Curated annotation (Swiss-Prot):
One GO MF term attached to the UniProt entry: amino acid binding
Name assigned to this protein: Aspartate carbamoyltransferase catalytic subunit
Annotated binding of L-aspartate, by residue: K83, R165, R226
Catalytic activity: carbamoyl phosphate + L-aspartate = N-carbamoyl-L-aspartate + phosphate + H(+)
PROSITE patterns linked: CARBAMOYLTRANSFERASE
InterPro entries noted in UniProt: Asp/Orn_carbamoyltranf_P-bd, Asp/Orn_carbamoylTrfase, Asp/Orn_carbamoylTrfase_sf, Asp_carbamoyltransf, Asp_carbamoyltransf_Asp/Orn-bd
Coiled coil ranges: none
Function: Catalyzes the condensation of carbamoyl phosphate and aspartate to form carbamoyl aspartate and inorganic phosphate, the committed step in the de novo pyrimidine nucleotide biosynthesis pathway.
């Protein structure tokens, strides 16, 4: 199901494929801090036109743990992009040197263009404001590892649900499971209508809320996203929203004992740092699971049948 496939959007993947990915990632956990030769001789090219810490490092670590090598760049500085080379030509060059390409770009559709140009499989490491499929896969994998299942859970998404690219992909991923999804944000920061229409058509159960306190007692998972300055064209709008939705120890007094708090990171002040040492904090575990999850993804795409 996975061999040779591009990973551009979550809409291309169903429940069966995700469950196969999760089982493979669980197997890969034992190799996440060692090195095996599953992909010896394979090369991954990374083309990160936007800043990244966790996504880039976890992809690079994953490939090296699998026995492969990594080439590429992080920012356009010092590359032919600075000289005016087109995205398509850059991808063609990387395609000639590698077996798989990971791209991050500020423009929506950049990963799709790369996939159309390249013969090698292309993985979207985040493009535009609406797609980050491997983060959504990681988010679901963390939930699956934490609870042993996804069906039947009440999952809250809180913060900037319009401009956070992780939210769009996560909603599309959740549409493969029987969950209740609580969208907690100001009305003007709800997910875009096109995404909501799609997940509703898939049967995802949604409710809208402006205050986390009114639903915190119902949630099994609370997924928090920061207000992203770089996604706002109007700095006044950013200042107005920043810090509006924050998780504190006081709020958690009403939460279920097993509530898992997730965050794609980096955080600013939307999660009180005093929560880091509570059983609710799963965001650092979530980040750590990025390596075995991406090991599994790369392995499934590149491995022989």
């Amino acid at each position: 199901m996975w061999r040779g496939r591009d990973v551009i959007t979550m809409r291309d993947f169903g429940r069966g494929e995700l469950e196969e990915l999760f089982e493979t990632a669980k197997y890969m956990e034992k190799y996440a801090k060692s090195r095996v030769d599953f992909l010896k001789g394979k090369i991954m090219a990374v083309a990160f036109f936007e800043p990244s810490t966790r996504t880039r490092l976890s992809f690079e670590t994953a490939m090296r743990r699998l026995g492969g090598d990594v080439i590429g760049f992080w920012g356009a500085e010092g590359t032919s992009v600075e000289k005016g080379e087109t995205l398509a030509d850059t991808i063609r060059m990387l395609d000639a040197y590698s077996n798989i390409i990971v791209i991050r770009h500020k423009l929506e559709g950049a990963a799709k263009l790369a996939a159309e140009v390249a013969e090698s499989p292309v993985i979207n490491g985040g493009d535009g404001a609406f797609n980050h499929p491997t983060q959504a896969m990681l988010d679901l994998y963390t939930i699956w590892r934490e609870f042993g299942h996804i069906d039947g859970l009440n999952i809250g998404l809180m913060g900037d649900l319009r401009y956070a690219r992780t939210i769009n992909s996560l909603l599309e991923a959740l549409a493969n499971f029987d969950v209740r999804t609580f969208l907690i944000s100001p009305e003007y920061l709800r997910p875009r209508a096109e995404t909501l229409d799609y997940v509703k058509s898939r049967g995802l159960k949604l409710s809208f809320h402006t205050n986390v306190e009114e639903v915190i007692h119902e949630l099994d998972v609370l997924y928090v996203v920061r207000v992203q300055r770089e996604r706002f064209l109007d700095p006044l709008e950013y200042e107005r929203v920043k810090g509006s939705y924050r998780v504190t120890l006081e709020i958690l007094k009403k939460a279920k004992k097993h509530l898992a708090i997730l965050h794609p990171l980096p955080r600013v002040d939307e999660i009180d740092h005093r929560l880091d040492n509570t059983p609710h904090a799963k965001y650092f575990k979530q980040a750590a699971l990025g390596v075995p999850l991406r090991m599994a993804l790369i392995y499934l795409i590149l491995s022989q049948p």
